[in-house]
Amino acid sequence: MSKENDRPGRIQFAEEEVHGARIKVVGVGGGGGNAVSRMIASGLQGVEFIAVNTDLQALRANRAPIKIQVGGKLTKGLGAGANPDVGRQAAVEDTEKICDALEGSDMVFITAGLGGGTGTGAAPVVASIASQLGGDTGSVLTVAVVTLPFSLEGKRRMGQAMDGLAQLKECVDSVIAIPNDRLLNSVARNTPVSEAFRVAAVPADAEATGP
């Protein structure tokens, strides 16, 4: 289904393994949405892209052909305010839209940045929906590729991320979790913190590449 190449955590779709399969990549929240936009910009073929967000402005700017605003009634088109409970409730509010978008999938990849509101709270809901699409056969393979906060973001945000990760593990077949601190090993030591955060805005180590 997927391979890891020499870049840790990076997924490469192998043509011989996914031929004929209907693959959907779902970016949840800001970080996940950025990852999807980057994959599209890189020219990745053979998959369907979906962006899910509470933030209507960010959603409109996303490159994904399928955009799902969740929690419109709850957040009024704004973000989840770094509150995973709001993100979860938003996704639950629009479960039917998510289910419709994922229908017919053979494989579902979910990408998100954990620690904030929408990605942390909504990603497990999306994963749960995807995992149930196969019914009793469980035929839909569901994989989550997520990033964890920088340690300097504090214990609260990391705690939220770990809670979200635990919830994801209950719903998916496999999880790849990439600590953002690892990004510091791939950029110059004198890189400003602001630049490190810019790099982390796209889960680069979770980038999917075509055959």
Language model: regions and residue ranges:
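Tubulin/FtsZ superfamily GTPase core signature
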Residues: 1-211
